[in-house]
Every structure is written in structure tokens, then in C-alpha cells.
Amino acid sequence: MLSIRTNYKTIYDNILDTAGEYLEKNRGIQSLVIGLSGGIDSALTCVIASELVKQFPGMRLIGRSIPIETNTDHEIIRARKIGENFCTHFQQEDLTFAFQNLYKDLMSNSHRKHSESYEEKIRRGNVKARLRMVYLFDLAHYEKGMVLSTDNYTELLLGFWTLHGDVGNYGFLQYLWKTEVYGLSQFLVDQYRSRNEISKADALQSCIDAVPTDGLGITTSDFDQIGVTDYTMVDNILIRYLKGEEENRDHPVIVRHIRSEFKRRDPQNISREALVQDSR
């Protein structure tokens, strides 16, 4: 159990209110664009966005499943079910061919040889994430929309994302713990079931039940990369550390948090003060 208490109805209402205020102030936005992976974060973001666009007649929620090479059939099916149940417009765009050609050129230009090492898988995964964002941002520009981020607070603190590859224009979940992402998702599943919207409930439930993975072909699950067995453990370790408790400082979760600080500070820039100071 997470060591903090969460009121999921309050969080849900606050997301809709805050995001609605943002769209009200930015009336030039005509659509919301989201990449659907079949995972819980993009699924929950899509579900919330489907309710948000109802506040703005004519605004579209455009969903894309963008498999590349290593995505499983199960991931693709889950993404499709979310897209078909919640998006105004949904389709699948396989970018495997584009990725393979791009990566072949990158390898050739840098004179690298193909390998199956862990580091090589990370590099390939980074290129996949960045290629997806190239596609989504181009689509958003064409549709006069904005790309929705799907990251959560746990991923932020662990550096569990690709620089310039996973971040959109606006995020609902960035400061929710991963455990809370699951909790809010289950809250919404229960709401759909209470209204007998079974197809929507089943689509979201399938993402809750799935083994979490980045879908980039680096490992078979998030836990393999993080070094733990569940997200409740991860979140509680991080919560205690952020409160100043030091007993877990050598735990792989905290080591990863500390080592990924450069990501949370990206991009680094020389300050105005440092530029103009007289050092003579």
C-alpha cells in the first residue's frame, strides 16, 4: 500500500478543471494528439482527455498507435481498444520501416557495427521514442493541436524516459505517483462499470492488468530495468527518501534517482548572471 492517501475523485476533477482552464486560455488549440502504447499511462491520459474534449465542442482527440519493430501483438491490441473506445479519431501507424532505415543510416554514418548489447538496445530504444515524437508533433502541427505527455512522477524521479523523446506539450499525470496512476485508472474503470459502459471499462482494465513495459525492446518489463518487483515498493522508497530518510540511499531505486538528475535539469544553460559578471 502507498504510504500516502489519495482521493481519486478529487484528483480526476482537478485534472479536468485545470486542463480545461488551460484550453480556455488557449483557444487556438483545436485538437489533442496522443500516442497510445497499450500501457497504463497513455491509456489513462487518453481516457481523461476523452472527457476533457467534451467541454469544447468541435475539439478532437486524435489517437495513434505507433508500433515499431519490438511492440507485441498484445500491446498493439490494447492500444487499439483504448483508441477505438475513447478517441474521436484513431488509427495505427507502423513506423518499423522508417525506423530501420533511419537506424541503418545512423549506424553507417558513425561506422558502428550491429550488436545485441544492453547499451545498443538503449540507443535503439531512444531513437524509437524520438521518432514517435517526430511523428506526433508533426501531426499536432497539421491538426492545430498539442501533444499530450503521458509521463508520471515516478518516471520523472527515476529518469525513466528518453530525453527529447517522451515529453509532449501538456501532461495530466506528471506529478502522480505510478501507484496513483493505477489507482485513478481503477477508479475510472469502476465508474464505467457502474454506468454499464463495459467496453470502455474492459479496455482500460486490460491496461491495468498488463505487465508494465516501455515497449522499446530494451527489457521485457519496467521492473527489469528498475531492479524491483512492483511500483508500490518503488514509490514508497522514493517518498521516504524525499522526506529525508537516508537508510535506502544505496538502494538501486535511489541510485537511479540520483544518477538521472541531469535529465531533470535538461537543458543546461549558462545563467544571465554568469554571462555578464566581471571576473577581472
List the predicted regions and their residue ranges.
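ATP/NTP-dependent adenylation/nucleotidyl-transfer catalytic domains that generate, transfer
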Residues: M1-I34, L44, I48-E51, G58-T72, ...
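Conserved G/P- and acidic residue-centered "switch" motifs that form tight phosphate/ATP-binding loops
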Residues: G39
